[in-house]
Structures are given as C-alpha cells and as structure tokens.
Amino acid sequence: MKLGSTLSPKFFDTYRHLPPSIRAKARDSYRLFAADPASVKFKTIKRLADGNQLCSARVTRDYRVLGVLANDIVIWFWIGSHDNYERLIRELR
C-alpha cells in the first residue's frame, strides 16, 4: 500500500527542539518513508476511537516519530527521544 504523509504544525513544535543531527536524520527518514514505509520500521500502535490509526516510525535507534493514519495519509504530529516516546505511548493507551 502506498501511503502519503504530511507534517502537522504540532510536529514542528517538537522538531525545533531536536539537535541538528537528529533533525537531519528526521528529514532523511521522511524521504525514506515516502519511498518505502517499511524502511523506517513503520508500524501501527493502536486503532483510535474515530477509526484512524496511531502509528510510529523509527528515525534513529534513540528517536521516534508519531502520526495518525487516515485515508492512506499519515499526519505526523510528534518527534522525540525513545524514552519520551515510550511515556507518550503509555499515556495514549
């Protein structure tokens, strides 16, 4: 399945606080995702009440990105450290 993606304004709130090297990796991962979502370990975390899906992808070993999959488009809304990702996922479940 071919997926599209877009970055929400909320995504940039977290993105701007990342180190430059991680921002560069995030840009690389975004391009990789466009070509092949599996290449960034794209996965569905849970189905949301509205029928959309909460998803994640790997940026580096220590950083993840979160998005909502709706109508074959992922709207990325958060990026951060794996530790913060784990905390956020626990809160969302």
What are the roles of these predicted feature ranges?
Residues 9-10, 51, 69-71:
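Short glycine-enriched loop/turn motifs at secondary-structure junctions
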Residues 27-32, 87:
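Short, charge- and proline-biased low-complexity linear segments
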Residues 1-29:
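Arg/Lys-rich, positively charged N-terminal/basic patches that mediate binding to nucleic acids
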Residues 31-57:
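A short, surface-exposed loop/turn module that caps and links secondary-structure elements
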Residues 5, 39-42, 79:
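Non-catalytic, surface-exposed connector residues within folded enzymatic/regulatory domains
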Residues 12, 30, 55, 76-78:
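Tryptophan-centered motif/residue detector
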Residues 13, 32, 84:
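Active-site micro-motifs of SAM-dependent methyltransferase domains
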